[in-house]
Amino acid sequence: MKTCFIGLGYIGLPTAIVAADNGIEVTGVDINPHVVETINRGKIHIVEPGLEELCSRVIGKGVLKAQTNPAESDVYLIVVPTPFTGNHQPDISYVEAATRSVIPYLKAGDLYIIESTSPVGTTEKMAQLIYTERPELKDNIYIAYCPERVLPGNVIYELVHNDRVIGGIDEASTEKAVDFYSRFVKGTLHKTNTRTAEMCKLTENSSRDVQIAFANELSLICDKAGINVWELITLANKHPRVNILQPGSGVGGHCIAVDPYFITADFPLESQIIGKAREINNYKAFWCAEKTQQAIRQFELEQGCEPVVALMGLAFKPNIDDLRESPAKYIATKVMQGHNDADFLIVEPNISEHKVFKLTDYREAYEKADIVAFLVAHEEFNELPWRDDKVILDFCGVFKKKNV
């Protein structure tokens, strides 16, 4: 079975590699020549534990090759970004462009799958696009939607062991897609239709966003009330039917921080809680920036000089290199406005360089700083001792037992 993956990013590349490692002949397509060249050397351009070793293995076996154009295959998977516009409207132009790129290669009996997170009805729209361009394929190819649901940092395991939701435009398409995924997925494959499968992914991430918003709102309340929010949540979770999540500096990434807008854009009146959760989580990042700026002003008043400030973490969540929609990056940018860049030590242990921020080793930054703002709870930070001689702003629970 020949399979063509369009998009070799944080999801497309691991999925292509895992599929290849399970005996599927894979062509991976990406418009970035550097990405293609890197993969063909058995290397990867992202950070994901264990993935580079697996990539090297499948490249060495000849079951995975990367290129910039599609190849004739039996299965085509669309795994490209679906961002939103400035007014939070979903942008499916990448999905459409990827679909157009494979239309010339499609033949009767082929399977076309979208994995990209998409607004409800996207798969049907792409089916109509295919039929318009290639009318002879109507009722002669299989079309389905199957959203990814993996955790960065544990992608290889979850690609294989997580359940998957698979929805075809008809029953035959669903069965065809189930047969494909059964070749490398050990989790249960749940059958449905395309619209339900599309909504399922949006629902999963919107649910997480709402729950995180509750925790973040609690952190704001506790700050004003003089309560340790970490202790509060630990105690509240002793109730057998309560499971409050942990607050942080906001919500980022290309899933939880984005997917709720796909619902609120199409169903604005019906999604009040979802919309408000987005506002709360966005506000939390603004609040963290304000708190840090207040600490800087207070230090200047008391000490008569500008402090050295360490901003700990830029990624959107712990222990990854992904900065997409990162609240930490927003906070760092906002806090540094109007100040001398030399007074700030920016830390992100999962990347070697950044085009905007000059990076500093986390131990050096912690030692030199007067004010330390923990924006992301990277595991490296757990080894740092509490220092009474520093102003510590712990927005993500690095020192959960301290009342900070």
Q: Where do the language-model regions lie?
A:
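Structural/interface elements that position substrates and couple domains in central-metabolism enzymes
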Residues: 1-404
